[in-house]
A protein has these predicted regions:
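Conserved class I S-adenosyl-L-methionine
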Residues: 72-83
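Short secondary-structure boundary/capping elements
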Residues: 55, 83, 156-157
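Class I SAM-dependent transferase core
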Residues: 2-74, 108-109, 115-121
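A general structural signal for well-ordered alpha-helical segments in protein cores
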Residues: 8, 28, 60, 88, ...
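Acidic active-site catalytic centers that drive phospho-/nucleotidyl reactions
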Residues: 59, 79, 104
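S-adenosylmethionine
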Residues: 98-101, 105-245
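Conserved SAM-binding loop of SAM-dependent methyltransferases across substrates and taxa
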Residues: 84-97
Length: 245
């Protein structure tokens, strides 16, 4: 069985699972082809097309089951540390009413993201910002208090994500961070402490799917207070001196 046939079958299965139409499936196919071909950006270590569909596209679209994402489906979303465009680009394809900012500080990854936006037919609905989150969310910056949803996957530990997301979110907005159940148990208390200082409140995590080794969950934090004047801290401080430590 050829790779093309296997990839097409995997995409059709994922698209059907999440109610996507043929045009959306085609956009995801173009994105997968770009992911596999764009070696210089080092955006993914996966080389098997079916693994890319299942682990990157499928895992991204699993977030569609999160109620807090559905309630914010027409707002401005931001993918924090977007890297390979996961989960931001698949979700932008799946939810046409959302506008998505793909934020990353690494130039070669930003170049990939620009190409991915074009290949996926998202010009005008998704844009790339090449900057650190602290700079993009600083006082007077366009990203401050501007987003209904901040998405994060495999970027940093949860207390760090909470602090970085806080000044990016509008009041009432939500941070949705994909984690394993084990990581959430290890990082949850520190993340809750960081959230309290940053004006966010944890909500019950949402199970995305189970694997033989662990469960994938979405950690949810809602912004309940205005952004504090001291946020964001200096670049790198969230990771160097986590608030919940």
């Amino acid at each position: 069985m050829s790779d093309d046939f296997r990839t097409r079958a995997a995409l059709e299965r994922v698209a059907a699972t999440h109610g996507l139409d043929a045009a959306q499936a085609g956009a995801l196919s173009a994105f997968v082809e770009l992911l596999l071909g764009w070696r210089r950006a080092n955006v993914t270590g996966l080389t098997d097309p079916v693994a890319v569909v299942d682990k990157l596209i499928g895992d991204s679209l699993a977030l569609l089951s999160v109620p807090q994402l559905r309630e914010r489906g027409t707002g401005a979303w931001l993918d924090l540390g977007a890297g390979a465009g996961i989960p931001g680009i698949p979700l932008a394809v799946a939810v046409p009413a959302a506008t998505v900012t793909l934020l990353d500080a690494v130039a070669r990854k930003c170049a990939f993201l620009e190409a991915a936006v074009t290949a996926s037919g998202l010009t005008g609905r998704a844009r790339v910002v090449c900057a650190r989150s602290e700079r993009y969310s600083s006082s007077g910056a366009p990203g401050r208090d501007a987003h209904a949803v901040v998405l994060a996957r495999a970027v940093s530990e949860l207390p760090v994500l909470v602090e970085l997301a806080a000044p990016l979110l509008a009041e009432g907005g939500v941070l949705l961070a994909s984690k394993t159940r084990r990581a959430l148990e290890e990082e949850g208390d520190a993340a809750a402490a960081a959230a309290e200082r940053c004006g966010l409140a944890p909500e019950p995590p949402v199970l995305l799917f189970a694997s033989p080794l662990d469960e994938a969950v979405c950690a949810v934090f809602r912004k309940t207070a205005p952004t504090a004047d001291w946020l964001p801290r200096r670049e790198g401080m969230a990771a160097k001196r986590p608030l919940g430590a």
